[in-house]
Amino acid sequence: MRGLVTAVRTLTVLPVPGKEAERFSSALFWFPVVGLFLGLLQAGAGYLAMLSGWPELAASMVLIAGVLLTRGMHADGFADMADGFFGGRDRESRLRIMKDPSVGSFGAIGLILLFLFKSIVLVKLLAFGLYPWIVSGVLLARLVQVALASMLPYARREGGTAAGFVEGAGIQHFVAAFLVALFILLLLMNGEMLPSGIGLSAAIAGAVLMSLLTIKKIGGVTGDVLGASSEFTEVLVWVSGVFLALCS
């Protein structure tokens, strides 16, 4: 269970007793489980806020819960990646910019657009009562983190925060996490193959797009890239849920 302790401490602000795993890569198996827990809390916040009959307020509560539960670290990674990828001219300058704790213009604009778009999509999900899709987005976002950590090299030669997860990870970690995530996803979707397949396809698309982009820009992944991939995947899965509802 040390892997679970490491996963919870890495992905959330929640204090948990116990010792962490000696190999951080062993925590990757638990990422979808932690994603399920986070998703349930965020969806629960949205459900309670929807009792007011105000979808916009409920969408804000979902986002606020997500930021508070994760220290906003994935959003921070998204901002850092936006600054580095669009502000740097070469691999080294991009990595240097991403390591800078300050937020630049690309990062600020990216965050504004990210949360604006998330809010719009969440309003629709909440109005339709699609709470399983909210949870699924958070769940699959953590699966994509495992996919990138397991299949791509670490970009920084000097190491970094996520190096322990990436350098010790292999395809077996992804396969195990994938099976766990798929089982949970099917439960959330009441065993229905169409919504499960669409949600999973959106997550796969997010993983592929992020992989192609980060390999082109910096030749691998960093902690910021893993965080950004989580944010990007949440959006894709939530959007796919809205489109499925509109087409039904």
Swiss-Prot record:
Which compartments is it annotated to reside in? Cell inner membrane
Quote the catalytic activity from the record: alpha-ribazole + adenosylcob(III)inamide-GDP = adenosylcob(III)alamin + GMP + H(+); alpha-ribazole 5'-phosphate + adenosylcob(III)inamide-GDP = adenosylcob(III)alamin 5'-phosphate + GMP + H(+)
Q: Which Pfam families match?
A: CobS (PF02654)
Q: Which co-factor is required?
A: Mg(2+)
What are the entry keywords?
Cell inner membrane, Cell membrane, Cobalamin biosynthesis, Magnesium, Membrane, Transferase, Transmembrane, Transmembrane helix
The residue ranges crossing the membrane are 28-48, 103-123, 126-146, 169-189, 193-213, 225-245
BP-aspect Gene Ontology terms: cobalamin biosynthetic process
Topology in membrane: Multi-pass membrane protein
- Give the enzyme class: transferase
Q: Which domain of life is it from?
A: Bacteria
Principal place where this protein is found? membrane
List the pathway annotation.
Cofactor biosynthesis; adenosylcobalamin biosynthesis; adenosylcobalamin from cob(II)yrinate a,c-diamide: step 7/7
A single GO cellular-component term on record? plasma membrane
Single GO MF descriptor: cobalamin 5'-phosphate synthase activity
Give the enzyme's EC designation.
2.7.8.26
Query: Which family is this sequence assigned to?
Result: Belongs to the CobS family.
The protein's matches in PANTHER family, at most eight in alphabetical order, are given as: ADENOSYLCOBINAMIDE-GDP RIBAZOLETRANSFERASE
Q: Its function?
A: Joins adenosylcobinamide-GDP and alpha-ribazole to generate adenosylcobalamin (Ado-cobalamin). Also synthesizes adenosylcobalamin 5'-phosphate from adenosylcobinamide-GDP and alpha-ribazole 5'-phosphate.
What this protein is called in its record is Adenosylcobinamide-GDP ribazoletransferase
Specify the species. Chlorobium phaeobacteroides (strain BS1)
Classification of source organism: Bacteria, Pseudomonadati, Chlorobiota, Chlorobiia, Chlorobiales
